[in-house]
């Protein structure tokens, strides 16, 4: 089974429509939240609406061996939520797949 919707953008469209229009404020925010004890949640906010976030979560779950979901946050909109501290993994994966450039990633947390 292949992921079909991760690379839906045209590589030549940047010259036509401007740079980085697929990311809302130009940044992808990666946050970590403490749950109970040693358990944490990693949230990813700021990815373009043109990507299917459920397919991205499905791919991340397989890649990182963790559970995840897409939640509707009242302030941030649709947010990816992954179990565990996946900040470094998600940064490397987003740049490897081409969904974000390294200078667009903003990591928050401890």
From Swiss-Prot:
CDD domains: eIF1_SUI1. GO terms for biological process: cellular response to hypoxia; formation of translation preinitiation complex; regulation of translation. The modification Phosphothreonine is found at residue 40. Keywords: Phosphoprotein, Protein biosynthesis, Translation regulation. One of its GO terms (molecular function) is translation initiation factor activity. The keyword Phosphoprotein applies. It comes from the Eukaryota. Probably involved in translation. Belongs to the SUI1 family. NCBIfam families: SUI1_MOF2. This is Eukaryotic translation initiation factor eIF1. It comes from Drosophila melanogaster. The lineage of its organism: Eukaryota, Metazoa, Ecdysozoa, Arthropoda, Hexapoda.
């Amino acid at each position: 089974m292949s992921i079909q919707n991760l690379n839906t953008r045209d590589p030549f469209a940047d010259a036509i429509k401007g740079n980085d229009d697929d990311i809302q404020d130009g940044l992808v925010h990666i946050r970590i939240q403490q749950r109970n004890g040693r358990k944490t949640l990693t949230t990813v906010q700021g990815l373009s609406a043109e990507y299917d976030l459920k397919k991205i979560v499905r791919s991340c779950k397989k890649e990182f061996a963790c559970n995840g979901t897409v939640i509707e946050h009242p302030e941030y909109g649709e947010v990816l939520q992954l179990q565990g501290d996946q900040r470094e993994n998600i940064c490397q994966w987003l740049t490897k797949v081409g969904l974000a450039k390294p200078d667009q990633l903003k990591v928050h947390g401890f």
